[in-house]
Amino acid sequence: MNERQKFTRNFSIIAHVDHGKSTLADRLLEIGLVTDKRTQKNQILDSMDIERERGITIKANNASFDYHAKDGNIYHLNLIDTPGHVDFTYEVSRSLAACEGVLLIVDASQGVEAQTLANLYLAMDLDLRIIPVINKIDLPSADIDKCKLMIEESLGLNPEEAIPISAKTGLNVQEVLEAICYLLPPPVGDVDAPLKALIYDSFFDTYMGVVAKVRLYDGRLKKGEMIHMMNIGRQFTVTEVGINRLSMVACEELQAGDVGYVVAGMKKMGDAKTGDTITHANRQTAEDVKGFKDAKPMVFAGLFPINGEDFDALVDAIEKLKLNDSALTFERENSAALGFGFRVGYLGLLHMEIVQERLEREFNLALITTAPSVKFRITTTKDEVIEVDNPSKWPDPILIGKSEEPFVKATIIAPESYVGNIMSLVIEKRGIHLDTVYLSKDKLQLTYELPLAELIFEFYDKLKSYTKGYASLDYEEVGYRDSKLVRMDILVNGEPVDALSSIVHKTKAEERGRVIIEKLKDLIPRHQFMIPLQAAIGSKVVARESISALRKNVTAKCYGGDISRKKKLLEKQKEGKKRMKQIGNVEIPQEAFLSILKTGD
Protein backbone atom coordinates (compact mmCIF):
# COMPACT_ATOMS: atom_id res chain seq x y z
CA MET A 1 0.00 0.00 0.00
CA ASN A 2 1.50 3.36 -1.00
CA GLU A 3 1.24 6.68 0.88
CA ARG A 4 -1.57 7.95 -1.38
CA GLN A 5 -3.75 4.89 -0.74
CA LYS A 6 -3.03 4.97 3.00
CA PHE A 7 -4.76 8.36 3.33
CA THR A 8 -7.61 7.75 0.82
CA ARG A 9 -11.13 6.86 1.96
CA ASN A 10 -13.92 5.92 -0.50
CA PHE A 11 -17.34 5.98 1.12
CA SER A 12 -21.06 6.23 0.42
CA ILE A 13 -24.03 7.42 2.42
CA ILE A 14 -27.06 5.12 2.44
CA ALA A 15 -30.46 5.86 3.96
CA HIS A 16 -34.21 5.59 3.53
CA VAL A 17 -35.86 8.38 1.50
CA ASP A 18 -36.00 11.64 3.46
CA HIS A 19 -33.73 10.61 6.33
CA GLY A 20 -31.30 13.45 5.55
CA LYS A 21 -28.71 11.86 3.27
CA SER A 22 -28.26 14.80 0.88
CA THR A 23 -28.24 17.26 3.83
CA LEU A 24 -25.42 15.33 5.52
CA ALA A 25 -23.52 15.28 2.22
CA ASP A 26 -23.91 19.09 2.06
CA ARG A 27 -22.49 19.50 5.59
CA LEU A 28 -19.52 17.19 4.89
CA LEU A 29 -18.70 19.08 1.70
CA GLU A 30 -19.16 22.40 3.49
CA ILE A 31 -16.42 21.39 5.94
CA GLY A 32 -14.23 19.68 3.32
CA LEU A 33 -14.57 22.01 0.36
CA VAL A 34 -15.53 25.12 2.35
CA THR A 35 -18.38 25.88 -0.08
CA ASP A 36 -19.57 29.47 0.03
CA LYS A 37 -22.89 29.58 1.91
CA ARG A 38 -24.14 32.49 -0.22
CA THR A 39 -23.75 30.62 -3.50
CA GLN A 40 -24.49 27.17 -2.09
CA LYS A 41 -27.64 25.42 -3.19
CA ASN A 42 -29.06 22.95 -0.72
CA GLN A 43 -28.48 19.36 -1.80
CA ILE A 44 -25.22 20.09 -3.61
CA LEU A 45 -24.91 16.59 -5.06
CA ASP A 46 -28.50 16.58 -6.36
CA SER A 47 -27.80 18.21 -9.71
CA MET A 48 -31.21 17.87 -11.37
CA ASP A 49 -34.02 20.31 -10.52
CA ILE A 50 -36.36 17.34 -10.09
CA GLU A 51 -34.01 15.88 -7.47
CA ARG A 52 -34.07 19.08 -5.43
CA GLU A 53 -37.83 19.61 -5.82
CA ARG A 54 -38.83 16.06 -4.90
CA GLY A 55 -36.11 15.82 -2.26
CA ILE A 56 -34.78 12.58 -3.72
CA THR A 57 -31.52 11.55 -5.37
CA ILE A 58 -31.75 9.86 -8.77
CA LYS A 59 -28.27 9.86 -10.31
CA ALA A 60 -25.21 8.70 -8.38
CA ASN A 61 -22.98 11.77 -8.04
CA ASN A 62 -19.61 12.05 -6.38
CA ALA A 63 -17.26 14.64 -4.91
CA SER A 64 -13.64 14.45 -3.77
CA PHE A 65 -12.23 16.64 -1.01
CA ASP A 66 -9.32 16.80 1.44
CA TYR A 67 -9.83 16.78 5.21
CA HIS A 68 -7.32 17.78 7.91
CA ALA A 69 -7.98 15.18 10.62
CA LYS A 70 -7.25 15.61 14.32
CA ASP A 71 -4.30 13.18 14.01
CA GLY A 72 -2.51 15.82 11.91
CA ASN A 73 -2.80 13.94 8.60
CA ILE A 74 -4.58 15.12 5.46
CA TYR A 75 -7.04 12.51 4.18
CA HIS A 76 -8.34 12.42 0.60
CA LEU A 77 -12.06 11.57 0.86
CA ASN A 78 -14.23 10.41 -2.06
CA LEU A 79 -17.94 10.70 -1.31
CA ILE A 80 -20.21 8.81 -3.69
CA ASP A 81 -23.84 9.83 -3.27
CA THR A 82 -26.50 7.13 -3.66
CA PRO A 83 -30.25 7.29 -4.32
CA GLY A 84 -32.57 6.09 -1.57
CA HIS A 85 -35.71 5.14 -3.51
CA VAL A 86 -36.58 1.50 -4.21
CA ASP A 87 -36.62 2.10 -8.00
CA PHE A 88 -32.98 3.10 -7.96
CA THR A 89 -31.47 0.11 -6.16
CA TYR A 90 -29.28 -0.46 -9.24
CA GLU A 91 -27.74 3.00 -8.74
CA VAL A 92 -27.03 2.14 -5.10
CA SER A 93 -25.39 -1.20 -5.94
CA ARG A 94 -23.07 0.32 -8.55
CA SER A 95 -22.04 3.17 -6.22
CA LEU A 96 -21.37 0.82 -3.30
CA ALA A 97 -19.14 -1.34 -5.49
CA ALA A 98 -16.76 1.65 -5.69
CA CYS A 99 -16.46 2.03 -1.87
CA GLU A 100 -14.78 0.41 1.14
CA GLY A 101 -17.29 1.68 3.68
CA VAL A 102 -20.65 3.38 4.19
CA LEU A 103 -22.40 5.76 6.55
CA LEU A 104 -25.82 4.28 7.35
CA ILE A 105 -28.24 7.03 8.36
CA VAL A 106 -31.16 6.30 10.68
CA ASP A 107 -33.74 9.02 11.37
CA ALA A 108 -33.86 9.66 15.14
CA SER A 109 -37.64 10.13 15.09
CA GLN A 110 -38.60 7.32 12.68
CA GLY A 111 -36.01 4.63 13.33
CA VAL A 112 -35.19 1.84 10.88
CA GLU A 113 -37.26 1.83 7.66
CA ALA A 114 -37.62 -0.67 4.80
CA GLN A 115 -35.01 0.85 2.51
CA THR A 116 -32.54 1.28 5.37
CA LEU A 117 -32.57 -2.54 5.58
CA ALA A 118 -32.49 -3.09 1.81
CA ASN A 119 -29.46 -0.83 1.36
CA LEU A 120 -27.75 -2.33 4.42
CA TYR A 121 -28.03 -5.82 2.88
CA LEU A 122 -26.47 -4.52 -0.37
CA ALA A 123 -23.54 -3.11 1.65
CA MET A 124 -23.16 -6.35 3.62
CA ASP A 125 -23.12 -8.42 0.40
CA LEU A 126 -20.14 -6.32 -0.73
CA ASP A 127 -18.44 -6.76 2.68
CA LEU A 128 -18.27 -3.02 3.39
CA ARG A 129 -17.47 -1.42 6.77
CA ILE A 130 -20.65 0.20 8.15
CA ILE A 131 -20.77 3.25 10.45
CA PRO A 132 -24.28 3.95 11.84
CA VAL A 133 -25.28 7.64 12.04
CA ILE A 134 -28.40 8.79 13.94
CA ASN A 135 -29.64 11.96 12.23
CA LYS A 136 -32.23 14.64 13.15
CA ILE A 137 -31.45 14.60 16.89
CA ASP A 138 -32.59 18.25 16.99
CA LEU A 139 -36.23 17.17 16.46
CA PRO A 140 -38.50 17.15 19.55
CA SER A 141 -39.65 13.62 18.63
CA ALA A 142 -36.06 12.25 18.45
CA ASP A 143 -35.44 9.11 20.52
CA ILE A 144 -31.72 8.26 20.40
CA ASP A 145 -31.86 5.34 22.87
CA LYS A 146 -34.66 3.65 20.93
CA CYS A 147 -32.68 4.12 17.70
CA LYS A 148 -29.57 2.57 19.24
CA LEU A 149 -31.64 -0.43 20.34
CA MET A 150 -33.01 -0.84 16.79
CA ILE A 151 -29.49 -0.49 15.33
CA GLU A 152 -28.36 -3.36 17.56
CA GLU A 153 -31.43 -5.62 17.29
CA SER A 154 -32.66 -4.97 13.73
CA LEU A 155 -29.40 -4.20 11.95
CA GLY A 156 -26.95 -6.22 14.04
CA LEU A 157 -24.49 -3.30 14.26
CA ASN A 158 -22.56 -1.96 17.26
CA PRO A 159 -24.72 0.79 18.84
CA GLU A 160 -21.65 2.27 20.59
CA GLU A 161 -20.28 3.27 17.18
CA ALA A 162 -23.50 5.14 16.27
CA ILE A 163 -22.84 8.88 15.97
CA PRO A 164 -25.81 11.11 16.94
CA ILE A 165 -25.88 14.20 14.67
CA SER A 166 -28.06 16.93 13.22
CA ALA A 167 -27.13 17.34 9.56
CA LYS A 168 -29.42 20.37 9.39
CA THR A 169 -27.59 22.36 12.08
CA GLY A 170 -24.18 20.71 11.59
CA LEU A 171 -24.08 19.35 15.17
CA ASN A 172 -21.45 16.56 15.53
CA VAL A 173 -20.83 16.37 11.76
CA GLN A 174 -17.08 16.80 12.38
CA GLU A 175 -17.22 13.54 14.38
CA VAL A 176 -18.54 11.76 11.29
CA LEU A 177 -15.51 12.91 9.27
CA GLU A 178 -13.18 11.72 12.03
CA ALA A 179 -14.94 8.31 12.09
CA ILE A 180 -14.52 8.01 8.31
CA CYS A 181 -10.76 8.54 8.69
CA TYR A 182 -10.34 6.18 11.69
CA LEU A 183 -12.90 3.42 11.12
CA LEU A 184 -13.03 2.95 7.35
CA PRO A 185 -10.26 0.90 5.72
CA PRO A 186 -8.07 2.45 3.01
CA PRO A 187 -8.40 1.05 -0.53
CA VAL A 188 -6.06 -1.80 -1.42
CA GLY A 189 -4.70 -2.34 -4.91
CA ASP A 190 -1.46 -2.77 -6.79
CA VAL A 191 -0.52 0.33 -8.78
CA ASP A 192 1.97 -1.71 -10.86
CA ALA A 193 -0.52 -4.47 -11.80
CA PRO A 194 -2.51 -4.34 -15.08
CA LEU A 195 -5.26 -1.71 -15.04
CA LYS A 196 -8.61 -2.82 -13.57
CA ALA A 197 -11.30 -0.13 -13.16
CA LEU A 198 -15.07 -0.33 -12.60
CA ILE A 199 -17.47 2.03 -14.38
CA TYR A 200 -20.05 2.77 -11.67
CA ASP A 201 -21.91 5.52 -13.54
CA SER A 202 -21.69 7.60 -16.71
CA PHE A 203 -23.22 10.71 -18.18
CA PHE A 204 -23.33 12.47 -21.53
CA ASP A 205 -21.56 15.77 -22.07
CA THR A 206 -22.30 17.77 -25.23
CA TYR A 207 -18.62 18.58 -25.84
CA MET A 208 -16.75 15.55 -24.50
CA GLY A 209 -19.25 12.80 -25.33
CA VAL A 210 -19.72 10.05 -22.74
CA VAL A 211 -17.89 10.63 -19.45
CA ALA A 212 -17.36 7.43 -17.42
CA LYS A 213 -17.16 7.66 -13.61
CA VAL A 214 -14.66 5.05 -12.48
CA ARG A 215 -13.08 3.42 -9.45
CA LEU A 216 -9.59 1.99 -10.01
CA TYR A 217 -8.82 -1.31 -8.25
CA ASP A 218 -5.39 -1.94 -9.81
CA GLY A 219 -2.94 -0.14 -12.07
CA ARG A 220 -2.73 3.43 -13.37
CA LEU A 221 -4.57 5.37 -16.08
CA LYS A 222 -3.42 8.48 -17.94
CA LYS A 223 -4.16 10.53 -21.05
CA GLY A 224 -3.15 9.03 -24.41
CA GLU A 225 -3.44 5.37 -23.32
CA MET A 226 -5.51 2.84 -25.25
CA ILE A 227 -8.22 1.23 -23.07
CA HIS A 228 -10.29 -1.91 -23.59
CA MET A 229 -13.89 -2.40 -22.34
CA MET A 230 -13.97 -6.01 -21.15
CA ASN A 231 -17.71 -6.68 -21.50
CA ILE A 232 -18.44 -5.01 -24.83
CA GLY A 233 -14.97 -5.63 -26.31
CA ARG A 234 -14.45 -2.09 -27.69
CA GLN A 235 -11.30 0.03 -27.49
CA PHE A 236 -10.81 3.79 -27.07
CA THR A 237 -7.98 6.30 -26.60
CA VAL A 238 -8.12 8.28 -23.35
CA THR A 239 -8.32 12.06 -23.93
CA GLU A 240 -8.70 13.14 -20.28
CA VAL A 241 -8.71 11.75 -16.74
CA GLY A 242 -9.55 13.64 -13.56
CA ILE A 243 -11.38 13.86 -10.25
CA ASN A 244 -14.64 15.54 -9.32
CA ARG A 245 -14.39 18.39 -6.80
CA LEU A 246 -18.07 19.26 -7.48
CA SER A 247 -16.89 20.25 -10.95
CA MET A 248 -14.55 18.11 -13.05
CA VAL A 249 -10.83 18.78 -12.50
CA ALA A 250 -8.37 17.15 -14.94
CA CYS A 251 -5.26 15.51 -13.48
CA GLU A 252 -2.08 13.75 -14.68
CA GLU A 253 -3.12 10.21 -13.79
CA LEU A 254 -5.50 8.07 -11.72
CA GLN A 255 -4.11 5.11 -9.80
CA ALA A 256 -5.35 2.12 -7.77
CA GLY A 257 -7.74 3.26 -5.02
CA ASP A 258 -8.80 6.48 -6.80
CA VAL A 259 -12.31 7.50 -7.79
CA GLY A 260 -12.45 9.77 -10.83
CA TYR A 261 -13.64 10.15 -14.41
CA VAL A 262 -12.41 9.11 -17.87
CA VAL A 263 -13.09 10.77 -21.24
CA ALA A 264 -12.15 8.66 -24.26
CA GLY A 265 -14.10 9.83 -27.31
CA MET A 266 -17.06 7.56 -26.50
CA LYS A 267 -20.09 8.66 -28.52
CA LYS A 268 -22.97 6.70 -26.99
CA MET A 269 -23.88 5.33 -23.56
CA GLY A 270 -23.53 1.75 -24.80
CA ASP A 271 -19.77 2.42 -25.08
CA ALA A 272 -19.47 2.93 -21.31
CA LYS A 273 -21.84 0.39 -19.80
CA THR A 274 -22.33 0.66 -16.09
CA GLY A 275 -20.64 -2.26 -14.38
CA ASP A 276 -18.16 -2.80 -17.22
CA THR A 277 -14.46 -3.15 -16.44
CA ILE A 278 -11.81 -0.95 -18.09
CA THR A 279 -8.32 -2.34 -18.69
CA HIS A 280 -5.36 -1.46 -20.94
CA ALA A 281 -5.65 -2.74 -24.52
CA ASN A 282 -2.03 -3.97 -24.60
CA ARG A 283 -1.81 -5.29 -21.00
CA GLN A 284 -5.14 -6.68 -19.85
CA THR A 285 -6.18 -7.74 -16.36
CA ALA A 286 -7.00 -11.44 -15.89
CA GLU A 287 -10.62 -10.99 -14.74
CA ASP A 288 -13.23 -8.26 -14.62
CA VAL A 289 -14.82 -6.72 -11.49
CA LYS A 290 -17.43 -9.11 -10.08
CA GLY A 291 -20.56 -8.62 -8.00
CA PHE A 292 -22.45 -6.31 -10.29
CA LYS A 293 -26.17 -6.55 -11.06
CA ASP A 294 -27.41 -5.20 -14.36
CA ALA A 295 -30.56 -3.08 -14.33
CA LYS A 296 -33.68 -4.68 -15.83
CA PRO A 297 -36.88 -2.78 -16.57
CA MET A 298 -39.82 -4.07 -14.50
CA VAL A 299 -42.65 -1.74 -15.51
CA PHE A 300 -43.77 -1.03 -19.08
CA ALA A 301 -46.08 1.66 -20.45
CA GLY A 302 -46.92 3.35 -23.74
CA LEU A 303 -45.71 6.94 -24.10
CA PHE A 304 -47.40 9.12 -26.72
CA PRO A 305 -47.27 12.82 -27.62
CA ILE A 306 -50.65 14.51 -27.06
CA ASN A 307 -50.04 16.41 -30.29
CA GLY A 308 -49.16 13.90 -33.03
CA GLU A 309 -46.88 16.45 -34.72
CA ASP A 310 -44.53 16.23 -31.70
CA PHE A 311 -43.53 12.61 -32.46
CA ASP A 312 -40.18 13.53 -34.08
CA ALA A 313 -39.39 15.79 -31.11
CA LEU A 314 -40.22 12.87 -28.75
CA VAL A 315 -37.88 10.54 -30.70
CA ASP A 316 -35.08 13.08 -30.34
CA ALA A 317 -35.86 13.72 -26.63
CA ILE A 318 -36.07 10.08 -25.56
CA GLU A 319 -32.81 9.23 -27.35
CA LYS A 320 -31.06 12.13 -25.57
CA LEU A 321 -32.50 11.06 -22.21
CA LYS A 322 -31.29 7.49 -22.81
CA LEU A 323 -27.75 8.92 -22.93
CA ASN A 324 -28.04 9.73 -19.21
CA ASP A 325 -30.28 6.85 -18.15
CA SER A 326 -28.89 3.44 -18.99
CA ALA A 327 -31.86 1.65 -17.39
CA LEU A 328 -34.40 3.08 -19.85
CA THR A 329 -35.53 0.84 -22.74
CA PHE A 330 -37.88 1.80 -25.56
CA GLU A 331 -39.31 0.59 -28.87
CA ARG A 332 -41.68 2.27 -31.30
CA GLU A 333 -45.39 1.55 -30.99
CA ASN A 334 -48.45 2.52 -32.99
CA SER A 335 -51.89 2.91 -31.41
CA ALA A 336 -55.12 3.43 -33.36
CA ALA A 337 -56.37 5.70 -30.57
CA LEU A 338 -53.21 7.63 -29.70
CA GLY A 339 -51.09 7.54 -32.86
CA PHE A 340 -47.33 6.99 -32.93
CA GLY A 341 -45.37 6.64 -29.70
CA PHE A 342 -43.09 4.33 -27.73
CA ARG A 343 -43.36 1.30 -25.49
CA VAL A 344 -41.01 2.24 -22.66
CA GLY A 345 -39.46 0.01 -19.97
CA TYR A 346 -38.83 1.54 -16.53
CA LEU A 347 -37.35 0.34 -13.24
CA GLY A 348 -40.52 1.24 -11.34
CA LEU A 349 -43.31 3.79 -11.02
CA LEU A 350 -41.15 6.62 -9.65
CA HIS A 351 -38.69 6.09 -12.50
CA MET A 352 -41.65 6.31 -14.93
CA GLU A 353 -42.90 9.56 -13.38
CA ILE A 354 -39.45 11.11 -13.42
CA VAL A 355 -38.76 10.17 -17.06
CA GLN A 356 -42.08 11.69 -18.16
CA GLU A 357 -41.47 14.80 -16.06
CA ARG A 358 -37.97 15.24 -17.48
CA LEU A 359 -39.23 14.82 -21.06
CA GLU A 360 -41.98 17.38 -20.47
CA ARG A 361 -39.77 19.84 -18.62
CA GLU A 362 -36.45 19.62 -20.44
CA PHE A 363 -37.85 19.14 -23.96
CA ASN A 364 -41.14 21.04 -23.61
CA LEU A 365 -43.38 18.13 -24.68
CA ALA A 366 -46.98 17.32 -23.70
CA LEU A 367 -47.22 13.54 -23.19
CA ILE A 368 -49.72 10.85 -22.28
CA THR A 369 -48.73 7.55 -20.61
CA THR A 370 -50.89 4.44 -20.91
CA ALA A 371 -51.65 2.24 -17.89
CA PRO A 372 -48.44 0.56 -16.66
CA SER A 373 -47.98 -3.17 -17.19
CA VAL A 374 -45.34 -5.80 -16.35
CA LYS A 375 -43.66 -8.53 -18.42
CA PHE A 376 -45.88 -11.62 -18.44
CA ARG A 377 -44.67 -15.04 -19.53
CA ILE A 378 -46.76 -17.38 -21.66
CA THR A 379 -46.15 -21.02 -22.55
CA THR A 380 -48.07 -21.83 -25.74
CA THR A 381 -49.79 -25.13 -26.49
CA LYS A 382 -46.74 -25.87 -28.71
CA ASP A 383 -44.44 -25.43 -25.65
CA GLU A 384 -42.94 -22.16 -26.89
CA VAL A 385 -42.21 -19.56 -24.18
CA ILE A 386 -42.97 -15.93 -25.05
CA GLU A 387 -42.78 -12.75 -22.96
CA VAL A 388 -45.47 -10.10 -23.32
CA ASP A 389 -45.36 -6.56 -21.92
CA ASN A 390 -48.02 -5.10 -24.22
CA PRO A 391 -51.71 -6.12 -24.23
CA SER A 392 -51.80 -5.77 -28.04
CA LYS A 393 -49.32 -8.69 -28.30
CA TRP A 394 -51.35 -11.03 -26.07
CA PRO A 395 -51.95 -14.27 -28.03
CA ASP A 396 -55.30 -15.89 -28.74
CA PRO A 397 -56.51 -17.76 -25.58
CA ILE A 398 -56.73 -21.00 -27.62
CA LEU A 399 -52.93 -20.88 -28.10
CA ILE A 400 -52.13 -20.35 -24.39
CA GLY A 401 -51.01 -23.42 -22.43
CA LYS A 402 -50.23 -21.53 -19.22
CA SER A 403 -49.63 -17.94 -18.20
CA GLU A 404 -47.27 -16.64 -15.50
CA GLU A 405 -46.64 -13.25 -13.93
CA PRO A 406 -43.69 -11.83 -11.97
CA PHE A 407 -43.98 -11.89 -8.17
CA VAL A 408 -42.06 -9.79 -5.66
CA LYS A 409 -41.14 -10.20 -2.03
CA ALA A 410 -42.34 -7.02 -0.36
CA THR A 411 -41.04 -5.87 3.02
CA ILE A 412 -43.33 -3.44 4.84
CA ILE A 413 -42.25 -1.73 8.06
CA ALA A 414 -45.06 -0.03 9.99
CA PRO A 415 -46.38 0.72 13.50
CA GLU A 416 -48.25 -2.21 15.05
CA SER A 417 -51.57 -0.32 15.12
CA TYR A 418 -51.81 -0.39 11.29
CA VAL A 419 -51.22 -4.12 10.77
CA GLY A 420 -54.94 -4.84 10.22
CA ASN A 421 -55.18 -2.20 7.47
CA ILE A 422 -52.04 -3.49 5.76
CA MET A 423 -53.28 -7.10 5.84
CA SER A 424 -56.60 -6.21 4.23
CA LEU A 425 -54.78 -4.21 1.52
CA VAL A 426 -52.40 -7.09 0.76
CA ILE A 427 -55.27 -9.61 0.61
CA GLU A 428 -57.09 -7.29 -1.81
CA LYS A 429 -53.89 -7.29 -3.91
CA ARG A 430 -53.63 -11.12 -3.99
CA GLY A 431 -50.69 -11.19 -1.56
CA ILE A 432 -49.45 -14.11 0.58
CA HIS A 433 -48.13 -13.51 4.10
CA LEU A 434 -44.64 -14.93 4.71
CA ASP A 435 -43.30 -13.52 7.97
CA THR A 436 -43.74 -10.99 10.80
CA VAL A 437 -40.83 -9.69 12.91
CA TYR A 438 -40.94 -7.16 15.76
CA LEU A 439 -38.23 -4.52 15.24
CA SER A 440 -39.20 -2.78 18.49
CA LYS A 441 -42.15 -3.11 20.86
CA ASP A 442 -44.45 -1.07 18.58
CA LYS A 443 -42.84 -1.44 15.12
CA LEU A 444 -43.20 -4.48 12.87
CA GLN A 445 -41.58 -5.82 9.74
CA LEU A 446 -44.10 -7.69 7.57
CA THR A 447 -42.99 -9.79 4.61
CA TYR A 448 -45.37 -10.69 1.79
CA GLU A 449 -45.23 -12.21 -1.65
CA LEU A 450 -47.48 -10.51 -4.18
CA PRO A 451 -47.78 -9.97 -7.94
CA LEU A 452 -45.73 -7.07 -9.29
CA ALA A 453 -48.72 -6.05 -11.42
CA GLU A 454 -50.72 -5.42 -8.22
CA LEU A 455 -47.83 -3.57 -6.60
CA ILE A 456 -47.61 -1.04 -9.45
CA PHE A 457 -51.37 -0.51 -9.46
CA GLU A 458 -51.93 2.12 -6.72
CA PHE A 459 -50.43 -0.11 -4.01
CA TYR A 460 -47.97 2.47 -2.68
CA ASP A 461 -50.56 5.27 -2.55
CA LYS A 462 -53.07 3.04 -0.76
CA LEU A 463 -50.42 1.79 1.68
CA LYS A 464 -49.56 5.38 2.59
CA SER A 465 -53.22 6.36 3.07
CA TYR A 466 -54.10 3.19 5.05
CA THR A 467 -51.20 3.85 7.45
CA LYS A 468 -51.36 7.68 7.53
CA GLY A 469 -47.95 7.76 5.82
CA TYR A 470 -46.16 5.74 8.51
CA ALA A 471 -45.46 2.58 6.49
CA SER A 472 -42.36 2.11 4.35
CA LEU A 473 -41.97 -0.37 1.52
CA ASP A 474 -39.16 -2.20 -0.23
CA TYR A 475 -39.39 -5.08 -2.70
CA GLU A 476 -37.28 -7.50 -4.71
CA GLU A 477 -38.09 -9.91 -7.54
CA VAL A 478 -38.64 -13.56 -6.68
CA GLY A 479 -39.42 -14.94 -10.14
CA TYR A 480 -42.56 -16.00 -12.00
CA ARG A 481 -45.64 -17.82 -10.68
CA ASP A 482 -48.58 -19.48 -12.48
CA SER A 483 -51.54 -17.15 -12.77
CA LYS A 484 -54.94 -17.02 -14.50
CA LEU A 485 -54.42 -14.01 -16.74
CA VAL A 486 -56.73 -12.62 -19.39
CA ARG A 487 -56.73 -9.69 -21.76
CA MET A 488 -59.56 -7.28 -21.08
CA ASP A 489 -60.69 -5.05 -23.95
CA ILE A 490 -62.78 -1.92 -23.64
CA LEU A 491 -65.32 -1.55 -26.46
CA VAL A 492 -66.94 1.76 -27.32
CA ASN A 493 -69.87 1.37 -29.71
CA GLY A 494 -68.66 -2.17 -30.44
CA GLU A 495 -65.12 -1.05 -31.39
CA PRO A 496 -62.16 -2.02 -29.14
CA VAL A 497 -60.03 0.93 -27.97
CA ASP A 498 -56.46 -0.42 -28.00
CA ALA A 499 -55.04 2.17 -25.57
CA LEU A 500 -57.44 0.99 -22.84
CA SER A 501 -56.77 -2.76 -23.18
CA SER A 502 -55.03 -4.36 -20.21
CA ILE A 503 -53.86 -7.76 -18.95
CA VAL A 504 -55.57 -8.58 -15.66
CA HIS A 505 -56.10 -11.51 -13.31
CA LYS A 506 -59.37 -13.28 -14.12
CA THR A 507 -60.83 -12.54 -10.67
CA LYS A 508 -60.15 -8.79 -11.05
CA ALA A 509 -61.47 -8.31 -14.58
CA GLU A 510 -65.06 -7.35 -13.70
CA GLU A 511 -64.04 -4.86 -11.00
CA ARG A 512 -61.39 -3.17 -13.21
CA GLY A 513 -63.68 -3.14 -16.22
CA ARG A 514 -66.50 -1.49 -14.28
CA VAL A 515 -64.21 1.29 -13.00
CA ILE A 516 -63.05 2.19 -16.54
CA ILE A 517 -66.50 2.00 -18.07
CA GLU A 518 -68.11 4.19 -15.41
CA LYS A 519 -65.36 6.75 -15.98
CA LEU A 520 -65.86 6.66 -19.74
CA LYS A 521 -69.60 7.14 -19.28
CA ASP A 522 -68.93 10.40 -17.45
CA LEU A 523 -66.31 11.60 -19.92
CA ILE A 524 -67.62 10.78 -23.41
CA PRO A 525 -70.12 13.41 -24.59
CA ARG A 526 -73.57 12.20 -25.69
CA HIS A 527 -74.10 11.65 -29.42
CA GLN A 528 -77.22 11.55 -31.61
CA PHE A 529 -77.36 7.79 -31.03
CA MET A 530 -77.00 5.52 -28.00
CA ILE A 531 -73.41 4.35 -27.30
CA PRO A 532 -72.86 0.99 -25.57
CA LEU A 533 -69.68 0.75 -23.43
CA GLN A 534 -68.41 -2.75 -22.68
CA ALA A 535 -65.52 -4.43 -20.90
CA ALA A 536 -64.97 -7.82 -22.50
CA ILE A 537 -62.74 -10.87 -22.21
CA GLY A 538 -62.82 -12.36 -25.69
CA SER A 539 -66.52 -12.47 -26.57
CA LYS A 540 -67.71 -12.47 -22.94
CA VAL A 541 -68.85 -9.07 -21.66
CA VAL A 542 -67.96 -8.60 -17.97
CA ALA A 543 -69.25 -5.04 -17.49
CA ARG A 544 -71.55 -2.76 -19.46
CA GLU A 545 -72.96 0.78 -19.43
CA SER A 546 -74.74 2.89 -22.05
CA ILE A 547 -74.55 6.56 -22.91
CA SER A 548 -78.09 7.63 -23.85
CA ALA A 549 -78.69 9.48 -27.11
CA LEU A 550 -79.34 13.17 -27.49
CA ARG A 551 -82.91 13.47 -28.68
CA LYS A 552 -84.36 16.10 -30.94
CA ASN A 553 -88.10 16.72 -30.51
CA VAL A 554 -89.24 15.93 -34.09
CA THR A 555 -92.94 16.10 -33.16
CA ALA A 556 -92.74 19.73 -32.04
CA LYS A 557 -94.26 20.99 -35.31
CA CYS A 558 -97.36 18.75 -34.98
CA TYR A 559 -100.09 20.77 -33.32
CA GLY A 560 -102.52 18.14 -32.06
CA GLY A 561 -103.64 16.21 -35.12
CA ASP A 562 -103.35 12.57 -35.94
CA ILE A 563 -101.26 10.31 -33.65
CA SER A 564 -100.12 8.28 -36.68
CA ARG A 565 -98.39 11.41 -38.02
CA LYS A 566 -96.33 11.63 -34.80
CA LYS A 567 -95.53 7.90 -34.93
CA LYS A 568 -94.38 8.26 -38.53
CA LEU A 569 -91.97 11.10 -37.61
CA LEU A 570 -90.56 9.14 -34.65
CA GLU A 571 -90.05 6.04 -36.83
CA LYS A 572 -88.28 8.17 -39.41
CA GLN A 573 -85.99 9.58 -36.68
CA LYS A 574 -85.25 6.05 -35.42
CA GLU A 575 -84.25 4.93 -38.95
CA GLY A 576 -81.95 7.93 -39.31
CA LYS A 577 -80.28 7.17 -35.97
CA LYS A 578 -79.81 3.53 -36.95
CA ARG A 579 -78.06 4.66 -40.13
CA MET A 580 -76.01 7.23 -38.19
CA LYS A 581 -74.95 4.58 -35.67
CA GLN A 582 -73.64 2.35 -38.44
CA ILE A 583 -71.71 5.20 -40.05
CA GLY A 584 -71.09 7.33 -36.98
CA ASN A 585 -67.75 7.05 -35.25
CA VAL A 586 -67.68 7.91 -31.57
CA GLU A 587 -65.34 10.78 -30.79
CA ILE A 588 -63.51 9.98 -27.56
CA PRO A 589 -62.04 13.22 -26.23
CA GLN A 590 -58.34 13.32 -25.29
CA GLU A 591 -59.35 14.29 -21.73
CA ALA A 592 -61.10 10.92 -21.36
CA PHE A 593 -57.82 9.08 -22.04
CA LEU A 594 -55.85 11.42 -19.82
CA SER A 595 -58.28 11.08 -16.93
CA ILE A 596 -58.46 7.27 -17.11
CA LEU A 597 -54.75 6.71 -17.63
CA LYS A 598 -53.63 9.25 -15.03
CA THR A 599 -55.37 7.42 -12.21
CA GLY A 600 -53.76 4.17 -13.33
CA ASP A 601 -57.23 2.67 -13.66
Swiss-Prot record:
It comes from Leptospira biflexa serovar Patoc (strain Patoc 1 / ATCC 23582 / Paris). CDD domains: EF4_II, EF4_III, LepA, lepA_C. Its EC number is 3.6.5.n1. It is found in: Cell inner membrane. This is Elongation factor 4. The keyword Cell membrane applies. It is an enzyme of class 3 (hydrolase). Keywords: Cell inner membrane, Cell membrane, GTP-binding, Hydrolase, Membrane, Nucleotide-binding, Protein biosynthesis. GO terms for cellular component: plasma membrane. Its main location: membrane.
